[in-house]
């Protein structure tokens, strides 16, 4: 494996949201739109994605502060793991690894824990893939979110996915699951917000949830020992900013974690292929990138969000591929599972 060591204090460009909007050719008046004027503009200015009139509930609580765009440590950037690999025109690991039960949509609720939730989900998928579906475990986002502080970030306020991957190497992470999941060490502690079809209603959410405390023990009533329940990684890295390198990484090892700038128009995404079109910068978000495809001659990435399975395309969304839209291809975090720890 080849690596490039980039001695950078900040890996991503430090432009303001307005500068980035201008760089993408978005008119100044379109950058300032919100509400109904924004919805009307999106519907007449593009045809790649359908627009929701109503914005995503608890939107501000689901994304991170823009400061988490900037990496604080030196990064190991991995070259294309297999430059000679044949890349298929489309790829969805759910069709390949049908026995992997880890491919489902999470719900981070009113907590900016996307960095931990997406990393835990990607690790879970990679464990299943590395073991050829023999090992099925949902890695605990809670363990990462609450115990990897301050090096990973600040829990529900946000964090850095690459640091979560490093934590997986050096500290290990226990089993987890969604809210109230039984027979796991540390399930997600924050209930889903509001109504979600026929799912259990736990109540509404107000503001950003406080970060729960770090508890280095399994929940009461679970016959697991915290230290023994841990799984470990053996490598963590940023994937080279190249469509083929990202595709090769996903083909070889499984889903990765992508981070991107979130603008006002993403608040109104319903379905289709998202491309930033209008609205101001609102924050930053981390998601699990699982595959890619093409629709009507438009290349896209296939991405699992963590805003419940009634958001977007059954919890997923697609974003235009090959243009680094919103920085989606700029900081792809990944890691290798230590199969001996499974």
Swiss-Prot record:
Record has Signal as a keyword: yes
Disulfide linkage: 100-128, 111-156, 147-214, 148-152, 185-218, 193-205
Positions of glycan attachment: 99, 138, 198, 296
Prosequence residues removed at maturation: 19-86
SMART domains referenced in this protein's UniProt entry, alphabetically: Pept_C1
Signal peptide extent: 1-18
UniProt-listed GO biological process terms: proteolysis
MF terms in GO: cysteine-type peptidase activity
Catalytic center residues: 114, 285, 305
Pfam families: Peptidase_C1 (PF00112)
EC number: 3.4.22.-
The keyword Plastid is annotated on this UniProt entry: no
Keyword annotations: Disulfide bond, Glycoprotein, Hydrolase, Protease, Signal, Thiol protease, Zymogen
PROSITE patterns, per database record: THIOL_PROTEASE_ASN, THIOL_PROTEASE_CYS, THIOL_PROTEASE_HIS
InterPro entries noted in UniProt: Papain-like_cys_pep_sf, Pept_asp_AS, Pept_cys_AS, Pept_his_AS, Peptidase_C1A, Peptidase_C1A_C
Family: Belongs to the peptidase C1 family.
Biological role stated in the UniProt entry: Expression of the protease correlates with blood-feeding and suggests a role for the protease in blood digestion.
PANTHER family reported in the protein's UniProt record: CYSTEINE PROTEASE FAMILY C1-RELATED
Record-given protein name: Cathepsin B-like cysteine proteinase 1
Organism annotation: Haemonchus contortus
Gene this protein is translated from: AC-1
């Amino acid at each position: 494996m080849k690596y490039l060591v980039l001695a950078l204090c900040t890996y991503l460009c430090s432009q303001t949201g307005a500068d980035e909007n201008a760089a993408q050719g978005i008119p100044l008046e379109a950058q300032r739109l919100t509400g109904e004027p924004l919805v009307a503009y999106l519907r007449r200015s593009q045809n790649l994605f359908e627009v929701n009139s109503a914005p995503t509930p608890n939107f501000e609580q689901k994304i991170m502060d823009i400061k988490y765009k900037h990496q604080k440590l030196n990064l190991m950037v991995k070259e294309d793991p297999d430059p000679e690999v044949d890349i298929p025109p489309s790829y969805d690991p759910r069709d390949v690894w049908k026995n992997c039960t880890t491919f489902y949509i999470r719900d981070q609720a009113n907590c900016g824990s996307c960095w931990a939730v997406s990393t835990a989900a990607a690790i879970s998928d990679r464990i299943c893939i590395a073991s050829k579906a023999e090992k099925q475990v949902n890695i605990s986002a809670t363990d990462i979110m609450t115990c990897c502080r301050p090096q990973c970030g600040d829990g529900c306020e946000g964090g850095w996915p690459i640091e979560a991957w490093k934590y997986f190497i050096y500290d290990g992470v226990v089993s987890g699951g969604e809210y109230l999941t039984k027979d796991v060490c540390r399930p997600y502690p924050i209930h889903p917000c509001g109504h979600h079809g026929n799912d259990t209603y736990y109540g509404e959410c107000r503001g950003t949830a406080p970060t729960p405390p770090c508890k280095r023990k399994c929940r009461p009533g679970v016959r697991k020992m915290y230290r023994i329940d841990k799984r470990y990684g053996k490598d963590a890295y940023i994937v080279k900013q190249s469509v083929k390198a990202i595709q090769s990484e996903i083909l070889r090892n499984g889903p990765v974690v992508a981070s991107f700038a979130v603008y006002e128009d993403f608040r109104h995404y319903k379905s289709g292929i998202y491309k930033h079109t209008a609205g101001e910068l609102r924050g930053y978000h981390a998601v699990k990138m699982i595959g890619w495809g093409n629709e009507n001659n438009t290349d896209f990435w296939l991405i699992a969000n963590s805003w419940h399975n009634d958001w977007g395309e059954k919890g997923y969304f697609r974003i235009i591929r090959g243009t680094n839209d919103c920085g989606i291809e700029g900081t792809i975090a990944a890691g290798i599972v230590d199969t001996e720890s499974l």
